[in-house]
Amino acid sequence: MFVDQVKIYVKAGNGGDGMVAFRREKFVPNGGPAGGDGGKGADVVFVVDEGLRTLVDFRFKRIFKAEHGEHGMSKSMHGRGAEDLVVKVPQGTIVKDIDTGEIIADLVAHGQRAVIAKAGRGGRGNKRFATPANPAPELSENGEPGQERNVQLELKVLADVGLVGFPSVGKSTLLSVVSAARPKIAAYHFTTIVPNLGMVDAGDGRSFVMADLPGLIEGASQGVGLGHQFLRHIERTRVIVHVIDMSGSEGRVPYEDYMAINNELEQYNLRLMERPQIIVANKMDMPDAEENLNEFKTKIAEDIPVFPISAVTKTGLRELLLAIADKLETTPEFPLNEILEQEDEDTVLYKYVADEPDFEISREPDGTFVLSGAKIERLFTMTNFERDASISRFARQLRAMGVDEALRKRGAKDGDIVRLLDYEFEFMD
């Protein structure tokens, strides 16, 4: 089954804790601090693997947690850093942050790497805090927590060729006879509801990937039917093969179908009309097909080639496949960052944003003061509260940031409860 969107959770490794230790050896008086630093945690890294074609593996594993760094040790030995957690994804994967909607990475080239969740650095051991005024400090840092994210992976099919057309014009049948793909084929509309991929051999040593995409209907560019799902898949297709039922067996007019499909492509994304398009007149083994083809040719430009075929009887296929292979050789790829030139909801618009304040103060109905903010929360989680010296250092950091004064201005008095993350303490004026 083809899966083109999936939501997963990623958690980078925490940094290892720093250690409080002292050098105690015979004949070495006043050995001094010897606590090592914690090791760096592991990043969560996505790497493009050209051998993967779908996101189906993520249906069975949706939680990815990287390893933590080792804690610091005595004798000034640092903890070992953890190895990055490498997650392989197919070409064309877009990674979005679910909470912010930001595009984190657009992975299109084999071997391309992107850090999706950054690891925390290791906490410093007490050797790092030695000063002339305090040569034997009894404080250390905890490791920094690793970043965690809920992300959505979106795969835009990286097929060389995309088959487009109204439902039941023979796209799935065509793919099944020119490749080893076995799409579902039936005599009703929307038999194909997800893309089917097939490797096609042109017969002269050249090959390409062809995608049988779900059928379009009028209004698809506004999301009617399978509209946006279909059009999302065709954005990176290099060559569009427009399949038309030339027999008109369903009471449709071939030229009107041709114009309607092109209109939907243009309405969705004007750049799609720049794709080379090959017109395929299918079902030429049916009555009235030849007459309809002649009429169709009179309504389009003379320099637009039309390839009459019958996917059922397999006539005209070799000429079509060679023409597609020739067209691919002269057609570049269309990366997403070139396609989305116009600003839309997926565009990353870079603008100046003021730095986030070090902390914010709010108050709950019961009178509790709540501290929040990335910087103050980071300082808190990296403080070793088992050591009095570390607690004193944290208090000095809060004072230097202006937290005490800000609480007083908000009306805090002796004994009031102040909450930071899941911990509470009393305010002392």
From Swiss-Prot:
Top-rank lineage group of the source organism: Bacteria
Cofactor names: Mg(2+)
CDD domains: Obg
Positions bound to Mg(2+): 172, 192
Family according to the record: Belongs to the TRAFAC class OBG-HflX-like GTPase superfamily. OBG GTPase family.
Role description: An essential GTPase which binds GTP, GDP and possibly (p)ppGpp with moderate affinity, with high nucleotide exchange rates and a fairly low GTP hydrolysis rate. Plays a role in control of the cell cycle, stress response, ribosome biogenesis and in those bacteria that undergo differentiation, in morphogenesis control.
Protein name: GTPase Obg
Source species of the chain: Listeria monocytogenes serotype 4a (strain HCC23)
